Amino acid sequence: MALWGGRFTQAADQRFKQFNDSLRFDYRLAEQDIVGSVAWSKALVTVGVLSADEQVQLEEALNNLLEEVRLNPQQILESDAEDIHSWVEGKLIDKVGQLGKKLHTGRSRNDQVATDLKLWCKDTIVELLSANRQLQNALVETAQNNQDAVMPGYTHLQRAQPVTFAHWSLAYVEMLARDESRLQDTLKRLDVSPLGSGALAGTAYEIDREQLAGWLGFASATRNSLDSVSDRDHVLELLSNASIGMVHLSRFAEDLIFFNSGEAGFVELSDRVTSGSSLMPQKKNPDALELIRGKCGRVQGALTGMMMTLKGLPLAYNKDMQEDKEGLFDALDTWLDCLHMGALVLDGIQVKRPRCQEAAQQGYANSTELADYLVAKGVPFREAHHIVGEAVVEAIRQGKPLEDLTLADLQKFSAVIGDDVYPILSLQSCLDKRAAKGGVSPKQVAQAIADAKSRLV
């Protein structure tokens, strides 16, 4: 069923119909389209287009259709309707006859689809926020269980300073918290209803659009009809949120892929999130994490594609905007799946503490402590930095960690070094000294865990 046709003397070419139709993807807006139609039927009563009895009939039929859709959304794809709006209207007419043809009075598919998509975005943000919280909680639990797991921290993928697996876990809690905040901000901006904006110039009926917005659960109605039907900022914002969120998940995945590798050996992933090789029986591949890392590109591609689609469009609605949905649906589905998978990866992960400790003791990660020790003895930092560099070269030559150099060896580089240097060079001392807010000291990490738990309640 097409919602247009009187102007045309020839039927559309079948190839054009297939090219033009959007039901194969916008069927996902069925529930939102029906909910919007119920609200619109109520608005039509207020302006005398529908009687109260007619509205009750329409609402009952629409609610029945909503239940049918929830039971079997795939039924929609069996239709040859042009789009979800055509499908819903056709089904409504099947149920109530000619009365169903009155529902579209004063409404355009332009404001209708804009409303549907915003309602869908609001629902999906709720799902994303829940999945984000689930992963944050999994990371906090991982941190709680691994406060004593000392490991090397890296810069340039070289061992830099000792940290703990708990501190590493909490770093990703911070990233996810920012993702959560961005989603909440986006929700505030998109929480305005375009319904009643018509095709572009507003509806010809004096509908109370603020009341209509309230019925649909929006905070308010939009202020300009031209902008209302052509605004896709919320699509761009959500794709941007997803792109940033997937960058965080990709980095999370990359870290764990490395930690799980034979070269690092810091963790072992559960069998539930790994796979084997068809040829090499010894392999246990981190496929879940590699897929998270790989899917980042498709999400960022959706953002780039949507920006290119919108950049040259004049006001108001253009058919180009039909391209807003497939990329958005796929990107947010992907982000949601990856958030769930990230939590699953952490469920059952084993941290190999002895190996983490061994790696932390290698790579001269306590070099900064020796420099700070020299500064405390009155040596200018830049000079101390140079002295420690020379000491590291000597330790490498001898094949020893810094703390195993003799006092005589260390005093070759600075006479101020005494026996009191050795406690300073221990891993525990390295951690304990980072006691400022946000640092890796056990006290600060414990406080960060407590703060995160309090925020996530």
From Swiss-Prot:
Its EC number is 4.3.2.1. Pathway: Amino-acid biosynthesis; L-arginine biosynthesis; L-arginine from L-ornithine and carbamoyl phosphate: step 3/3. Gene3D superfamilies: Fumarase/aspartase (C-terminal domain), Fumarase/aspartase (Central domain), Fumarase/aspartase (N-terminal domain). It comes from the Bacteria. InterPro entries: Arg_succ_lyase_C (IPR029419), Argininosuccinate_lyase (IPR009049), Fumarase/histidase_N (IPR024083), Fumarate_lyase_CS (IPR020557), Fumarate_lyase_fam (IPR000362), Fumarate_lyase_N (IPR022761), L-Aspartase-like (IPR008948). GO terms for molecular function: argininosuccinate lyase activity. Keywords: Amino-acid biosynthesis, Arginine biosynthesis, Cytoplasm, Lyase. It catalyses: 2-(N(omega)-L-arginino)succinate = fumarate + L-arginine. It is an enzyme of class 4 (lyase). It is found in: Cytoplasm. GO terms for biological process: arginine biosynthetic process via ornithine; L-arginine biosynthetic process. One of its GO terms (cellular component) is cytosol. Its main location: cytoplasm. Belongs to the lyase 1 family. Argininosuccinate lyase subfamily. This is Argininosuccinate lyase.
